[in-house]
């Protein structure tokens, strides 16, 4: 709905989804772009794939202009990445944080979340990519069509990637002494319009070309054992095979946990310093893939309020990252070089 800023009177109200049929929640507000109110949402598993949408409404009238489902249906691009999983059983790829907007390119830049359940052996196989979960999507502002996408990882652990994307124009000169993965075809020092920042719970900084989604560079900011490689030329991510769940009741040791790394707390960017600033956590967990939260193993892990996420079929016992006594950090990272300019650590 929209309110008159001068009087507080309601100007229009539009139903986007019937929560009884396509359950979803708004955990962040919309943005206004090109005269449109652009909104994302967290879609509940029981709401089905049609609840997992981004939508655009005329900001003056409330009329729907477009909606973009984030889970492909049969016959659509990306359908094959779900294998044999029926369309109605594809759940929970949400867009529950605030998007960014580039008016020159006419692009809405949005991040997406994990599937439900998270371990992919429950969803037709661990090798399937299950688009468009844990991805950066560039949508045409006028139509909602996907111009390009980049998938940050195939997520088995509820390590969402919906967080803020920073739109920056900067020289791109990643320092090989500081940055783990670099595109070998980069021209160092070239000024480019990029998307940068920490988009997901893994705490990895990604820098992509804004117009094309081309991978430029990426580097971790916390201890993590989830991503073991990124192909610099293609941007393709390799997850750690030793911690990918293969069966129910399997326990793996994962860093970070679904608490992050990074989580809801937003980072910031200063054009004066060309540096981004992020609050982060040093967390790990013994994590269990299970559909039975009454089992002895699940009870032992979650005892004392440690945590179980039934919609993801995960249970966990969280701990500090080995080798540190500080949970919290604030890290300042150069958008040009990827160098850590400074690091503040605190117990909480």
Model region roles, listed by residue range:
Residues 1-54, 60, 64-89, 94-96:
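Asp-box/WD-like beta-propeller blade repeats and closely related beta-sheet repeat scaffolds
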Residues 4-5, 15, 23-24, 42, ...:
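Short, solvent-exposed loop/turn and secondary-structure capping segments
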Residues 9-18, 63-71, 76-89, 127, ...:
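Aromatic (tryptophan-biased) beta-strands that constitute blades/sheets of beta-rich domains
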């Amino acid at each position: 709905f929209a309110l008159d800023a001068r009087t507080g009177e309601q100007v229009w109200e539009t139903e986007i989804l019937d929560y009884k049929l396509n359950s979803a929640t708004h955990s962040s507000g919309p943005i206004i772009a090109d005269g449109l109110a652009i909104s994302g949402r967290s879609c509940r598993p029981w709401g089905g794939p049609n609840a997992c949408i981004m939508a655009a409404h005329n900001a003056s009238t409330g009329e729907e202009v477009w909606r973009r489902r984030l889970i492909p249906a049969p016959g659509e691009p990306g359908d094959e990445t779900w294998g044999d999983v029926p369309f109605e059983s594809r759940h929970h790829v949400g867009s529950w944080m605030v998007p960014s907007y580039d008016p020159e390119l006419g692009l809405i830049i949005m991040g997406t979340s994990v599937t439900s359940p998270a371990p992919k052996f429950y969803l037709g196989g661990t090798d399937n990519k299950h688009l468009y979960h844990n991805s950066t999507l560039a949508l045409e502002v006028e139509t909602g069509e996907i111009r390009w996408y980049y998938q940050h990882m195939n997520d088995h652990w509820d390590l969402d990637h919906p967080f803020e994307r920073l739109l920056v124009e900067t020289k791109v000169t990643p320092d090989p002494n500081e940055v783990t993965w670099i595109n070998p075809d980069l021209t160092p020092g070239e000024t480019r319009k990029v998307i940068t920042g920490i988009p997901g719970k893994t705490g990895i900084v990604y820098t992509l070309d804004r117009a094309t989604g081309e991978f430029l560079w990426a580097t971790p900011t916390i201890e993590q054992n989830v991503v073991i490689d990124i192909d610099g030329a293609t941007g393709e991510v390799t997850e750690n095979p030793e911690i990918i769940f293969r069966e129910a009741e399997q326990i793996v040791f994962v860093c970070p946990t679904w608490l992050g790394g990074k989580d809801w707390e937003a980072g910031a960017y200063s054009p004066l310093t060309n540096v981004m600033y992020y609050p982060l956590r040093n967390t790990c967990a013994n994590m269990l893939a299970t559909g039975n939260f009454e089992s002895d193993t699940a009870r032992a892990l979650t005892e004392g309020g440690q945590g179980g996420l039934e919609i993801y079929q995960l249970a966990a016992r969280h701990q500090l990252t080995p080798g540190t006594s500080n949970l919290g950090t604030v890290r300042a990272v150069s958008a040009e070089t990827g160098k850590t300019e400074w690091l503040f650590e605190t117990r909480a």
